[in-house]
């Protein structure tokens, strides 16, 4: 029986930025919690000379090789060299491209970094990121109607990270902290266009996070109250009541990753759902 590895080398070769590979590699590696992946990322590999140098590194530290290289000659070199070294190599996009070709009845153009063209979508994401930075942590200037979504919640419910993730998807997101005893900005209630959604979690989960992170800009709470579960439960009750009173959807983030929370918000946006609910 093969002894389980405590770590392994993961080589990622790309003719672009390597983001696609990194996401795919980490998604797969996450399924093997007992084996740590040592990542070797090689972006912008577009010549045989560059590739040969990469292959030398793989030979020195053998491991799984994933690649996204549109040049068929370079792809063949990777596969042949890896076979000679006795390490597995996988073209991550090839099965997808083959499916597209079969369905569309036409071959791909095979342009390196085609997904990173500076198009309208790229500039939309940049605009959304700028918007998020200007509307973080309760900053609500007069252009709040330009927001696609406004996230509300008590401290440490992942409002800012979720806003950043949404901005990277081109969604203009603002976020507002809900603090017991401090009035919510009136401009929030007047907003007509944006979807307003509340984030909550269990008191236990929030207490755990708060104990490991600084108090931040909440002068009305001392450290003891900030991490006390009873006090947190009161904050959560206030937040839930506020959301229910105004018909804002509620998402429990206790067991959700940032990506999963953002996906839930995107689903609400797609469905145009602004009815009060808890999910």
UniProtKB/Swiss-Prot annotation:
<keyword id="KW-0808">Transferase</keyword>
<dbReference type="InterPro" id="IPR026565">
    <property type="entry name" value="PPDK_reg"/>
</dbReference>
<comment type="similarity">
    <text>Belongs to the pyruvate, phosphate/water dikinase regulatory protein family. PDRP subfamily.</text>
</comment>
<dbReference type="InterPro" id="IPR005177">
    <property type="entry name" value="Kinase-pyrophosphorylase"/>
</dbReference>
<keyword id="KW-0418">Kinase</keyword>
<keyword id="KW-0723">Serine/threonine-protein kinase</keyword>
<dbReference type="GO" id="GO:0005524">
    <property type="term" value="F:ATP binding"/>
</dbReference>
<protein>
    <recommendedName>
        <fullName>Putative pyruvate, phosphate dikinase regulatory protein</fullName>
        <ecNumber>2.7.11.32</ecNumber>
        <ecNumber>2.7.4.27</ecNumber>
    </recommendedName>
</protein>
<comment type="function">
    <text>Bifunctional serine/threonine kinase and phosphorylase involved in the regulation of the pyruvate, phosphate dikinase (PPDK) by catalyzing its phosphorylation/dephosphorylation.</text>
</comment>
<feature type="binding site">
    <location>
        <begin position="153"/>
        <end position="160"/>
    </location>
    <ligand>
        <name>ADP</name>
    </ligand>
</feature>
<dbReference type="GO" id="GO:0004674">
    <property type="term" value="F:protein serine/threonine kinase activity"/>
</dbReference>
<dbReference type="GO" id="GO:0016776">
    <property type="term" value="F:phosphotransferase activity, phosphate group as acceptor"/>
</dbReference>
<dbReference type="GO" id="GO:0043531">
    <property type="term" value="F:ADP binding"/>
</dbReference>
<dbReference type="Pfam" id="PF03618">
    <property type="entry name" value="Kinase-PPPase"/>
</dbReference>
<keyword id="KW-0547">Nucleotide-binding</keyword>
């Amino acid at each position: 029986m093969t002894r389980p590895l405590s770590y392994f080398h993961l080589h990622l070769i790309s003719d672009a930025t390597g983001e696609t590979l990194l996401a795919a590699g980490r998604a797969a590696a996450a399924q093997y919690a007992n084996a740590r992946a040592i990542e070797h990322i090689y972006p912008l590999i577009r010549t045989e000379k560059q590739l040969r140098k990469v292959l030398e590194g793989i030979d020195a530290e053998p491991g799984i090789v994933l690649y996204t290289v549109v040049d068929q000659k370079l792809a063949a070199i990777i596969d042949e060299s890896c076979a000679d070294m006795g390490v597995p190599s996988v073209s991550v996009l090839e099965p997808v491209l083959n499916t597209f070709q079969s369905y569309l009845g036409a071959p791909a153009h095979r342009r390196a970094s085609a997904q990173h063209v500076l198009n309208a979508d790229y500039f939309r994401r940049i605009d959304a990121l700028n918007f998020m930075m200007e509307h973080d942590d309760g900053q609500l200037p007069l252009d709040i109607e330009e927001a696609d979504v406004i996230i509300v919640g008590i401290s440490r419910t992942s409002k800012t990270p979720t806003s950043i993730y949404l901005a990277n998807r081109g969604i203009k997101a603002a976020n507002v902290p809900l603090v017991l005893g401090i009035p919510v900005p009136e401009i929030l209630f007047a907003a007509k266009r944006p979807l307003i959604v509340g984030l909550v979690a269990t008191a236990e989960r929030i207490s755990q996070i708060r104990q490991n992170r600084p108090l931040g800009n909440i002068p009305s709470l001392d450290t003891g109250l900030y991490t006390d579960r009873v006090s947190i439960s009161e904050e959560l009750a206030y937040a839930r009541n506020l959301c229910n009173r105004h018909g804002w959807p509620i998402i429990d983030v206790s067991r959700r990753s940032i990506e999963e929370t953002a996906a839930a918000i995107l689903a609400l946006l797609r469905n145009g759902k602004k009815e009060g609910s808890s999910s």
